[in-house]
Amino acid sequence: MKINFFYNLKKIFNKIEVLFIRHSAVDSNIFLLNKNHDHIRSILLYFPDYEMMHFGDHLFFEPLAKYLNMGGYQVTIAPVKHMEFYFRDLGYRVKSEGHFDDIDLIITRVEFIKALRRSKKQVLFIDTASSKIERHLCNDMIEKVSQFLGMSNVGYDPIPSYPDSLGIENLSFLNMEKKYIVFNNYVDSGSVRVGSRHQKILIDFIKELKVKTGFDVIHTGSIKDKASDSRFYDFVDIDARGETSVRDLFALCSLGNVLLNVSFDGLQMHLFFMKNKKSFILFSGRFLKKNADYIKKYVNPPFFTDSINDIIEYI
């Protein structure tokens, strides 16, 4: 597994940047830049850089966007390019680039402190990885942002929405009469914590699961994942690595005959959560136990469910 040292260095510097904005905290994990008393009407959810905002991270903010829309705010999303379809399909206004003149408040993650520290707009930075969070992440963001904005306490849906009209024209490799396990053994942000031992555990598990269920295995991943991986996977029935887009992955995971997921804790896992399907997860870990405990308790999944054993089992 290739380790992105530059990415990890940026994450370390970001932790230092957070220390310098602690004085502007409005909650244990939320910080406000450029506080003013102007009436807030338009809100931008800003996270356009993949290195700082992976695909799965986008999903955590959709329930907040949904809640703000319901509260009468004009919501715009600035996601990474490959996630624009997700928000557009759900009816949100998507902003690829440009000025912020028509925006009253920017909401983003602390990972974007450097990008926005010179902004003249009000910016609400959220530390979504804080072990101080004591609720499921989607619920927590809605509750705290709602309190900041002085919104009335109305009901909300903390489960990220799933687009309806995704299309399966790029999934012609599927046999709709068969049942499938989706398998992904790649990680981005956790690569420094994942090695050959973890790969063996994951591969041994899915081999046994395939025999036990009789399901076919679809191997997913990017073009880069496939190019950097010389292993031969004799248990894989369909190698879809590099053959599908992020949108296609959403479509794949939504199908009725795609029943199980085996992966690290990433996008694929969260898509299965959203469809109330079972994932077998090899946790990529965290350096500190309190951070690992937080992720397992409040991010996997990021919303409350009373049937957690039906959607996740750790390997």
Give the role of each language-model region:
Residues 2-92:
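N-terminal pre-catalytic "stem/leader" segment of glycosyltransferase-like enzymes
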Residues 21, 128-180, 187:
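A nucleotide-sugar donor-handling region in carbohydrate enzymes
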Residues 33-37, 221-248, 294-315:
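Extended, non-globular alpha-helical segments
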Residues 42-47, 176-192:
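Conserved donor-binding/catalytic core segment of Leloir-type glycosyltransferases
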Residues 54-64, 71, 188-219:
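Conserved catalytic-core segment of nucleotide-activated headgroup transferases in glycan assembly
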Residues 61, 67-154:
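Secretory-pathway glycan-assembly enzymes, especially type II membrane glycosyltransferases
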Residues 104-105, 180, 260:
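Structural motif
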